[in-house]
């Protein structure tokens, strides 16, 4: 219930002191706040925690743009949770370690953020986090016993006040309370007035009215119900007492505070919910949960139905920059790993003609009898031939005679080098069209009749349509680029803009398909340079986990695009970029030290799907047969990547999916469950934790690479008719479940 605890965000100062009934803990979200008690003032800056104990006088004074948040526990709630509430007097001291302070702030930030977001299961998640917060305080924040913290003149009067706070909803009397402390009624009444300046009945009614105000503000309960549950004998008695203390009737008081909901109460002043979430992100850190923070439950029933649709796997094209990079043994190993895991068989290299022209025009002459100007190129070709990779070369600035001559020398040499071995699958890729290309392609096709020509396709290509038509018989594929980051302004928080960006890749694909149709061009497409929303910095690109978004794009593209491009690794990729924004145009498979990025595992998991589709919807696809099938579930949420700048982003949501696969043949099934999400397989978090100003040593590198893998669970399950699976889906996560029935014995 709301009356058990309050979760608030405050942007305005308190004018007067209040005496707290209960326990309050909070921290400064932004700016500076002065926390006053009866005798002292404590200056708190951003991130500082404050605690106010039961019966303390307190007041907040917020400096300009200051924001604080707090959780206030009612005494009755604490009494229900703890055997002895007198032990709940907390004090932050040097004994409270920085780690524990961070953890307290972490829990509170998540709690306030959950409260603001107000999702389907926010109330349950709040209650879990509240318990976690109290447990952490009990274990890690120093406490003193109540008897050392008396704020009144007499301990017995203090006991009576505590008793009233815990039992105000009951039928209390002065005689009952005097018996409780062993005094006469007259003596208790006298001591009460001396200590508090008010009589017993006045104090009791004040306590009841304060609790009733909370119910009037935050619940829809009837006034009669509120009266009875706060200790009044009737609605009429409640109304009289309420008006005496507030000069308003309960109905008038409630009417002055319309439409205050649990999620609105935290968003005060001129701060939007999302701004508060973004500010709270700075205080949320990764932590091991002993409480599940499930925010949504989804039930999915699947029965396989025959379909005419097939899932097409992609031809993966890996960019390596300069051809000589293939001499690097680490890069060779990475390519072979890709080839083994998801059938990579094509390498795209930059133009070698400038390199050859430089050698051909050198001031000294290479003697063919004692040297070979193509020595390093031949070693690269041998690696490709040995491992059945095809080579695609990006030609650039090929409109000069010197370039064409160098091209012919190079192509002739390659043809001679591979003539005594199996054929090399050789392709040329051009991004601009020039008439000199006709001569070059004719020469190339004469020596490599099975060679391919890739042509970049965009709006500008239409200006060269006649030349494109002449080249069409030689063209194998059209190539294009698409970057969702180009569609948004990351300084804005407009959700509609990010929704538009989520469709950018598929929209451009459809546009090009329509362009080809209008001009009667029929060739398969290759998406070479592409990216989903990542932000425009290296940090957002790493922190914003987007595995599910990438899977979503691959599924949408599988029937429209034949090839998908990636850079091999971070070092090769970044060395060919002008700036961070340019870097965001593409995705690489490896980080440094052979660390596999999540996109690597996304491609690996996608490759485990087979062609026959048994079921599909917006977040799930099942392929295979009824006895050997693959279930792919994913979450794809597109939002501003800057909201993900935290190890455990505040836009993170957790969904429990109860999945039933119906009408299966009875038997024992083997389950292999891969989980790729922010907590399983995300390289960037581990990398940053183990990276020092001097880099990483071998132990750290090996550990990070071992731990940065999808989670794998393997088990057998006996199925009669329905296979039931429970899947915890984190924002933008992926679950690939392979199911195979054992043969009958």
Swiss-Prot record:
Residue ranges of every copy of the HTH araC/xylS-type domain listed in the record: 158-256
> Which superkingdom heads the taxonomic lineage of this protein's source?
Bacteria
Start-end of DNA-binding region: 175-196, 223-246
Alphabetically sorted, this entry's keywords are:
DNA-binding, Repeat, Transcription, Transcription regulation
Single GO molecular function: sequence-specific DNA binding
- One of its Pfam families is HTH_18
Q: Does the keyword DNA-binding apply?
A: yes
Record PANTHER family = ARAC-FAMILY TRANSCRIPTIONAL REGULATOR, HTH-TYPE TRANSCRIPTIONAL ACTIVATOR RHAS
> What is the name of the protein in this document?
Uncharacterized HTH-type transcriptional regulator SAR0107
**Organism this protein belongs to:** Staphylococcus aureus (strain MRSA252)
């Amino acid at each position: 219930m709301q009356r058990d605890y309050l979760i608030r965000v405050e942007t305005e100062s308190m004018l007067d002191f209040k005496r707290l009934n209960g326990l309050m803990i909070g921290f400064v979200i932004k700016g500076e706040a002065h926390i006053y008690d009866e005798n002292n003032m404590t200056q708190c800056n951003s991130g500082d925690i404050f605690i106010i104990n039961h019966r303390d006088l307190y007041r907040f004074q917020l400096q300009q743009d200051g924001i604080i948040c707090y959780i206030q526990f009612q005494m009755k709630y604490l009494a229900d949770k703890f055997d002895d509430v007198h032990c709940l007097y907390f004090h932050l001291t040097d004994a409270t370690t920085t780690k524990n302070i961070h953890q307290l702030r972490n829990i509170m930030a998540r709690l306030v953020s959950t409260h603001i977001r107000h999702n389907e299961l926010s109330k349950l998640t709040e209650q879990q986090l509240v318990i976690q917060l109290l447990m952490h305080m009990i274990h890690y924040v120093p406490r003193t016993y109540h008897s050392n913290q008396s704020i009144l003149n007499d301990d017995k009067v203090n006991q009576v006040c505590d008793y009233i706070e815990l039992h105000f909803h009951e039928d209390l009397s002065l005689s009952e309370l005097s018996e409780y402390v062993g005094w006469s009624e007259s003596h208790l009444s006298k001591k009460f007035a001396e200590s508090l300046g008010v009589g017993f009945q006045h104090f009791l009614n004040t306590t009841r009215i304060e609790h009733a105000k909370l119910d009037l503000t935050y619940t829809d309960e009837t006034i009669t119900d509120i009266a009875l549950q706060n200790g009044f004998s009737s609605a009429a008695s409640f109304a009289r007492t309420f008006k005496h203390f507030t000069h308003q009737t309960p109905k008038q008081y409630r009417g002055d505070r319309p439409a205050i909901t649990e999620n609105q109460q935290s968003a005060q002043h001129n701060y939007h919910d999302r701004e508060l979430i973004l500010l709270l992100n700075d205080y949320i850190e990764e932590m091991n949960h002993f409480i599940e923070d499930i925010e949504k439950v989804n039930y999915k029933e699947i029965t396989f139905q025959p379909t005419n649709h097939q899932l097409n796997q992609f031809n993966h094209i890996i960019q390596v920059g300069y051809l000589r990079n293939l001499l690097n043994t680490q890069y060779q190993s990475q390519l072979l790993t890709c080839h083994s895991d998801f059938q990579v068989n094509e390498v795209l290299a930059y133009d070698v003609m400038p390199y050859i022209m430089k050698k051909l025009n050198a001031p000294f002459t290479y003697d063919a009898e004692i040297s070979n100007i193509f020595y390093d190129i031949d070693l690269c070709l041998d690696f490709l031939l040995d491992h059945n990779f095809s080579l695609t070369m990006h030609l650039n600035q090929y409109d000069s005679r010197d370039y064409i001559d160098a091209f012919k020398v190079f192509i002739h040499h390659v043809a001679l080098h591979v003539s005594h071995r199996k054929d090399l699958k050789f392709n040329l890729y051009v991004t601009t069209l020039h008439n000199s290309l006709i001569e070059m392609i004719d020469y190339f096709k004469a020596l490599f009749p099975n060679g391919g020509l890739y042509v970049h396709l965009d709006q500008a290509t239409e200006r060269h349509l006649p030349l494109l038509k002449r080249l069409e018989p030689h063209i194998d594929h059209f190539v294009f680029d698409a970057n969702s980051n180009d569609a948004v302004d990351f300084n804005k928080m407009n959700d509609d803009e990010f929704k538009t960006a989520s469709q950018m890749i598929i929209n451009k694909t459809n546009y090009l398909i329509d362009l080809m149709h209008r001009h009667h061009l029929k060739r398969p497409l290759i998406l070479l340079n592409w990216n989903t929303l990542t932000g425009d910095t290296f940090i957002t690109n790493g922190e914003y986990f987007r595995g599910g978004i990438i899977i979503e794009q691959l599924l949408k593209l599988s029937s429209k695009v034949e090839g998908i491009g990636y850079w091999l690794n971070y070092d090769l990729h970044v060395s060919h970029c002008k700036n961070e924004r340019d870097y965001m145009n593409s995705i690489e498979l490896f980080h440094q030290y052979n660390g596999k990025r999540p996109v690597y595992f996304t491609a690996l998991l996608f490759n485990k799907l087979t062609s026959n589709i048994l079921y599909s919807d917006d977040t799930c696809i099942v392929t295979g047969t009824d006895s050997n099938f693959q279930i792919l579930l994913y979450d794809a949420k597109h939002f501003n990547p800057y909201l993900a700048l935290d190890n455990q982003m505040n836009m993170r949501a957790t969904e429990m999916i109860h999945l039933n696969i119906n009408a299966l043949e009875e038997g024992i099934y083997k389950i292999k469950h891969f989980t790729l999400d922010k907590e399983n397989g995300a390289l960037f978090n581990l990398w940053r934790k183990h990276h020092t100003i001097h880099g990483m040593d071998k132990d750290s590198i090996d550990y990070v690479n071992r731990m940065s893998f999808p989670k794998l669970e393997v088990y057998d399950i006996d199925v009669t008719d329905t296979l039931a699976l429970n899947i915890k889906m984190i924002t933008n996560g992926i679950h690939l479940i392979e199911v195979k029935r054992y043969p009958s014995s």
